[in-house]
Amino acid sequence: AAVAAVGGAASLVGMKQAWDPLPSVLAGGFTTVDLASIKAGEPETFVWRGKPVFVLKKTAQMEQSPRDLTVGADRFIIAIGLCTHLGCIPAWAKDKWKCACHGGEYDSSAKQTFGPPPRPLDLPPFSVKGTVITLGEEGPEYTAIAATMKA
């Protein structure tokens, strides 16, 4: 009976390991971005879980928004780079993102300003540590910004 118990326990451990995601899969769920390297007014695109994510360091002339992430003295917008109309990837053009598919436009705060998009660009979950954000991890900054978007 003891041999059967040990064998049963060993098989349960093996089954659990098979069910758990591989470390490479877990690591693929997070992308880190150092905000210190981003130039003001020039958004950069990063890939998180196969989706483009726009990170824009705002210039002093760009409007303030409740969606702004403030790190030190700098303001940033973080948005999933897929048009909320049909999922095309908007391109940055002179202080706004323009979607070539159906003419949708988003301002520097990722808010829809023209065309068919039904809502602003989506906000990916993120956390902040110093000047580094981790996409895919919900931190207090994400929670606060997401709450303003629902209000």
Give each language-model segment a name:
Residues 1-3:
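N-terminal secretory signal peptides and thylakoid transit peptides that target proteins
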Residues 6-51:
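C-terminal segment of N-terminal export signals and the immediately downstream linker at the start
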Residues 37-71:
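A broadly conserved sequence feature marking short terminus-proximal activation segments
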Residues 57-151:
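Rieske [2Fe-2S] iron-sulfur-binding domain
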